[in-house]
Every structure is written in structure tokens, then in C-alpha cells.
């Protein structure tokens, strides 16, 4: 039996996690430990972990390779691994868990491996599954490894969202880059405004509290991750330009001779764009979130 045929028939695989010391790398190790039917053995490589395995032996040992490297380095790491794996890649499944998809999927496809691009739309959870979360799935090339990937995706318990890699990047730019940029811009304006956060808290509205909480959530993360999300794809940079243009329009409208005549129709057009159902549901979610910010009563 060939190596490739053997890979399709055995229920378990030898899994290599590239980026095993990172947050999702550690989550993956826990996930495979909780799903032993998927992985006979899991080994990892990470420059931050001196005890991890070097990439060269992993390239010839692994059946399944999962790249969980920092988004700014993913394509380069895939290229280095491909140079080590060479013909062995044709018998392997390569997956990546990164926030952009077109470039990593293309880099993996160039190797000859079977390819699946993944983007969990959440930070690594404390649980060993993704129940209640969305997982974008960008299929690059699957044949022999399709049964294993089906079992893998089922075990995640996530809501699967199949997308073309380029379409993922277009949507992610609006879902992630645009939102992160808006929060960063607000924080930059606040930092330059001359007041401390404690001083602003004394006059804070519930909406300000929610916006500030979102900003603090962003600041609690890895600056390199957010810098990459904002800059690595043309789609993300286009979203930033759209935000700039929208802010410029608002400034011009507010500075105009008749600001209400400019602003009110625009806000009404946004109400029509969103629709009554979305507005009602979003306002209800806002009220629930505000309740969550209130200090507990005695």
C-alpha cells in the first residue's frame, strides 16, 4: 500500500503544529489531546520553546501540518517548511490558522500538499472545542485527506463557514480591520485629548463605556497581530481608506453651513441600509451589554 493510500485509511495522523507555543498552537495541542481518534501523536515547533522539535525532522515525520505562526510571518514560515518537506509534502495535509487566507493558502498550494485554510473567528477559547463560534473554511486542495478533515472539522463543533480565500479576506477586512482601526482611532484621539481615562470615567455614558471596553480588549492583545490585520492585505488597507474617507466626510458635513441638512439625511440612509430588524436586534444586544457593565448591587 502506498503512503498516500495508507494516510487515507488510517483513522489517526501524526500531527505537527508549527507555532506550538502561541495561543492557538497551545489550543490545538489541547484539542488533539481531547480528540485522540484524530491524532496518534502531536509534536510542535516554535522558536519561543527551546524544547520543541526542529522543523526539518517534523517535515519528514508529519502526516498533518498545522501552521499557527504569527500572521506577519505565516507565508515565510510556510515557504521554509516547504523547502524542508520537498516531495514529502505531496503525501501530507497542510492547514493554517491565521487571520488572512489568500496568501497562506496560495503558499501552501505551491508545496504540492493537500490544503485547507482555516480562520476561527474568535480568540482561543478555554474549552477544547469551538462550539458557538464560527470557523471559516477555505478549501484549497483536498482528496486523500478529505475524510480526516471532515472528522477534524466535526470535532471542532464550530459553525462552519465555507468561503473562497479571497472572499474571506474581503469580508475579514470589514469585520476585523475596519473595526480595529475605528477603535484604535478613537483611542488615539482620546490619548491626544488631554484627559486621563479616570477623568473621562466621571462623565462616561454607557456607550462610551462599551467603546472603551472594546478598546481595552484590543490593547490587551498582541500589537503585532493587529498591525498585521490592518496592513497585510490590500483589502484591509482599502477598509482603512474607506474609514478615513467616512471620517473626512463627517468632518466636512459638521463644518458646513448647514450641518443638520447634511448629517440627518445621511443617518436616515444608514437606518434604511441596516433595516428595522437589525436595528432592533442590535439595540437589544447593546442594552444587554450595558447591563453587564453595571456594578453589582449590594
What are the roles of these predicted feature ranges?
Residues 57-84:
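Rossmann-like NAD(P)-binding element
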Residues 30-34, 79, 83, 106-110:
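Short, well-ordered alpha-helices that flank and scaffold nucleotide-derived cofactor binding pockets
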Amino acid at each position: 500500500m502506498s503512503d498516500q493510500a495508507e494516510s487515507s485509511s488510517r483513522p489517526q495522523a501524526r500531527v505537527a503544529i508549527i507555532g506550538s507555543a502561541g495561543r492557538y498552537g497551545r489550543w490545538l495541542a489541547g484539542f488533539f489531546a481531547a480528540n485522540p481518534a484524530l491524532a496518534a501523536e502531536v509534536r510542535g515547533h516554535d522558536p519561543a520553546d527551546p524544547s520543541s522539535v526542529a522543523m526539518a525532522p517534523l517535515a519528514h515525520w508529519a502526516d498533518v501540518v498545522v501552521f499557527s505562526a504569527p500572521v506577519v510571518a505565516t507565508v515565510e514560515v510556510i515557504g521554509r517548511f516547504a523547502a524542508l518537506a520537498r516531495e514529502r509534502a505531496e503525501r501530507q495535509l497542510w492547514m493554517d490558522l491565521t487571520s488572512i487566507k489568500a496568501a497562506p493558502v496560495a503558499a501552501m498550494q505551491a508545496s504540492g500538499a493537500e490544503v485547507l485554510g482555516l480562520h476561527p473567528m474568535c480568540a482561543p477559547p478555554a474549552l477544547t472545542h469551538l462550539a458557538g463560534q464560527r470557523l471559516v473554511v477555505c478549501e484549497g486542495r483536498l482528496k486523500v485527506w478529505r475524510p480526516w478533515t471532515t472528522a477534524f472539522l466535526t470535532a471542532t463543533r464550530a459553525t462552519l463557514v465555507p468561503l473562497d480565500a479571497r472572499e474571506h479576506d474581503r469580508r475579514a477586512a470589514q469585520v476585523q480591520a475596519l473595526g480595529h482601526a475605528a477603535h484604535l482611532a478613537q483611542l488615539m484621539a482620546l490619548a491626544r485629548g488631554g484627559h486621563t481615562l479616570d477623568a473621562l470615567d466621571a462623565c462616561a455614558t454607557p456607550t462610551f463605556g462599551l467603546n472603551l471596553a472594546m478598546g481595552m480588549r484590543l490593547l490587551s492583545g498582541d500589537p503585532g497581530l493587529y498591525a498585521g490585520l490592518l496592513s497585510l492585505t490590500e483589502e484591509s488597507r482599502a477598509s482603512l481608506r474607506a474609514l478615513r474617507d467616512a471620517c473626512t466626510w463627517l468632518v466636512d458635513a459638521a463644518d458646513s453651513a448647514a450641518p443638520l441638512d447634511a448629517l440627518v439625511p445621511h443617518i436616515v440612509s444608514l437606518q434604511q441600509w441596516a433595516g428595522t430588524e437589525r436595528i432592533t436586534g442590535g439595540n437589544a444586544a447593546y442594552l444587554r451589554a450595558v447591563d453587564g457593565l453595571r456594578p453589582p448591587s449590594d
